[in-house]
Amino acid sequence: GHYESEKYFIDYKKEIIQFFKIKKEKVDINNRYKKDIDNSNSVSICIRQNRYSEGKHKDHDKSNKFTKDTIDYIYKSIEHIKKNVEKPKFFIWSNDLSNLSGYFNQDECIFIDNKQNKSVNDFYLFNFCKHFIVGPTSFHWWGAWLNENPNKICIRPLNLNPSNNIDFWPENWVSI
């Protein structure tokens, strides 16, 4: 099930953050990514491809409705961030980076390729991002929610999540 309705646990946010805090010694971290994230107005984008797409095949072209809708949402969110954040740098995580570079400006984006498939490294890096463009993925939802930056901007999709859970998204997250 989904556990992304903060109304059930908001009173325990500090304790939950401490419980899920990842210790440095538990991760095999690439310091270059962390340094880039720390030294920029970092914006985390996580794209989990083909999770909710209509077809069961891995069709990565622009005709794939989920990919198209997701990319459109991210473009609009990037524009919102650019209007509200000085010199943002976008860090893109995905379960499949093979076709994403063609969609994004290489000068503004860093693609984080987790070849070792250690999600704990990605989750660890989410802690240091300053802002989030959250897709319909519980993994990134938790990464954004657990991030302790009090000034973070979290953008969430208005219509990409197939869930009928009306309180899925925190109220202070911007919907686009």
Feature annotation, model-predicted:
Residues 71, 75, 80-164:
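Donor-binding and catalytic core of enzymes assembling or modifying cell-surface/extracellular glycoconjugates
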Residues 162-176:
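Leloir-type glycosyltransferase catalytic cores
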